[in-house]
Amino acid sequence: MAASVAPGVRTLWWAGAAWLRQGGIRELFRPRIEGSTPGRDFSLSHYQSTVIVERWWKVPLAGEGRKPHLHRRHRVYKLVEDTKHRPKDNLELILTQSVDEIGVRGDLVSVKKSVGRNKLLSQGLAVYASPENRKLFEEEKSLRREGKLEKIQTKAGEATVKFLRSCHLEVGMKNNVKWELNPEIVARHFFKNLGVVVAPHALRLPEEPITRWGEYWCDVTVNGLDTVRVPMSVVLFQKPKTKRYKHWLAQQAAKSVAPTNPQAV
């Protein structure tokens, strides 16, 4: 059973169709003029994309100087590739300033086009990697290596500085012998506890000798440029536990957490 249309809806439909026939379409697409009645806003731009197709039926060869004769079947195509699904290429830029998690000045980076255009280029943090810009920054790097320009922190150095600012070092010392903390011991604990390789000459401890347990500090200089003060706790040395003992502790903890089965009656 067909659905009936209300008389009011039918009247509105016929009125709209009549308005379109009488020039309403031109009115819709007419450009907006200042001071006149507001027009309609339409996006008339086409979606720009490329689709690769090939003919389903091969076109027979034609004679020399003649065009091939196409039949209806030769206008049937099959889709080979839609280029909008291709992975988008990155944008190569040269940084003019240090940017967190991307690089430092002079680094050639490859980023997404959205990041490069909306963040780096628009804020003056990078320039396009043109041959002229590449040559300019290569000359700047060579001058820095020769010592004619001030050195800047490397990307790894900036990451190290950021990591050390959030660290707390714990140094274990025994109580059965006399000891005095020195940069060599602190450097070993940096590598053992934090996984950071620190040269002893890059460490600076308090002037007063450290011979007791307590809370102290140490200064770490990264690449001779940035210095970070790391809080340090000197505590009682505890012998590291073996893997077998840790496995046994985990089993005991699992047994204590597991629910006990009720006894059958």
UniProtKB/Swiss-Prot annotation:
Source species: Mus musculus (Mouse)
Chief location of this protein within or outside the cell: mitochondrion
Family according to the record: Belongs to the bacterial ribosomal protein bL9 family.
Record-level GO BP terms: mitochondrial translation
InterPro entries, per database record: MRP-L9_N, Ribosomal_bL9, Ribosomal_bL9/RNase_H1_N, Ribosomal_bL9_N, Ribosomal_bL9_N_sf, Ribosomal_bL9m_C
Subunit structure: Component of the mitochondrial ribosome large subunit (39S) which comprises a 16S rRNA and about 50 distinct proteins.
Protein name: Large ribosomal subunit protein bL9m
Transit peptide: 1-49
Entry keyword set: Mitochondrion, Ribonucleoprotein, Ribosomal protein, Transit peptide
